[in-house]
Amino acid sequence: MRINYCENGCMLYYKDYIDLESCKFCQRAHFRKAPSGKKVDVKAMHYLPLIPRLKRLYASNRSAPHMRWHHENRRPPGVMCHPSDGEAWKHFDRKYPEFAAEPRNIRLGLCSDGFTPYSVSAAPYSCWPVYLTPYNLPPEMCMTSPYIFLNCIIPGPLNPKIMIDVYFQPLIDELNQLWIERVETFDVSLKQNFNLWAVLMWTISDFFAYGMLSGWMKTGKLACPYCMENTKSFTLKHGQKNCWFDCHRRFLPMDHEFRNMKNEFRNNTVDRDCPPPIYTREQVWERAQHFPKVTEEQPYKFDGYGVAHNWTKQSIFWELSYWKDHLLRHNLDPMHTEKNYFDNLFNTVMDVNDKTKDNIKARMDLPEYCR
C-alpha cells in the first residue's frame, strides 16, 4: 500500500486529505510535474496492512494451534520465560477480562529503529522500518523472522524525530479497528469462525527512539522518564554535558550505609533524599493530554520545556483507548543499551583513537566531582 506524504513529513495524504494539492501545514506541493506532463507524487511511503497477516496466522496449521500456547502452557509462579508470565500481561487480563477470556485474541509488540541502508556513506541517510510481532506464540516461535511483521518503512533521508507519529496513522487506524470493531477470522485448527480482537501491548526501542515514541524527549537534564522533573542530574563544569553521576543513591533504603559515604561517590556529598515519586498511569495521561498531537498542529517547544518538563507532543498511541490502562507502555532494547555501554567502556579502557571518552575535559572534571 503506497501512501503519499508531505515533502517535509508534516502530514500524510491519507483518508480525508488524500485529494489535497498541498500540505495543510507548510503548503508544499503534493505533486510535481514529470517531463511527460503527468502529475507525480513528491514523496511516498510503503505501508503493509496488519489485519490480513493476523488472519493468516489462523489460516495455517503451522501457526494456528500455537496461537493459544500462552494460555494452555501456564508456568508456575516465579518462573518467567514468556511475556505472559509478566505483571503487565496479567494486569491487562484483570483490566479486560472479556479480552483475556478468548486465548486466540492477539497481543502485539512494536519495534522501530533507524538505520542506514546498504552501507555507511558520506551523506547521512536515516530509514526507519516499523515491526510488529504477536506474543501469543511460544518463545521459540514469536521472535523468529516469519512472525516478525514489517508494517511500514519510514523513508529518509532525514530522521523523523517527533514527527514519527505522522507515519503511524494507518497502523493506529487498524489497531483501533481490531479493538473496537474486531475482525471475523477462521481458525483452521478448531474449524470455526471467531471475532479476532488484538491489542498493542508496548513498544521496544533504544533510548533515543523511546523519546520519539513516548513524547518525553531523551535530551537535556530531564531525559530520565522516571525521575522526570525530580531529577538530580547536573551539567559537567568543563565537559558541559548532562551527567547523572550519583543519582542512584536516592533509590537505596534510607538506612543504607552508602547514603552516608561522603567521598566514595560524589565528592563531599551525602544523600538524604527520598526516591522520586512513581507516577501512575492516570497521572501520566493527565500530563500528556494537554499537549497537541503532531498530526493536528505543527510541533513547537512549550513553556517550561527542558526546565519543568520534556514533553514535545501527545503521542499518537494515546489514541488507543486502552493505552492509558497499560502497566508498561515503552521498553528499552537491551541490545542497544549493552552495546553502547560496552563500546564506551572498552574504547576508553583500550584508549581507542577517536572513540575514547578519556579527554582533557573529562580529566578536568574528575577532581571536581570525585575524590
Language-model features and meaning:
Residues M1-R371:
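Domain-level cores of phosphate- or acyl-group-handling catalytic modules
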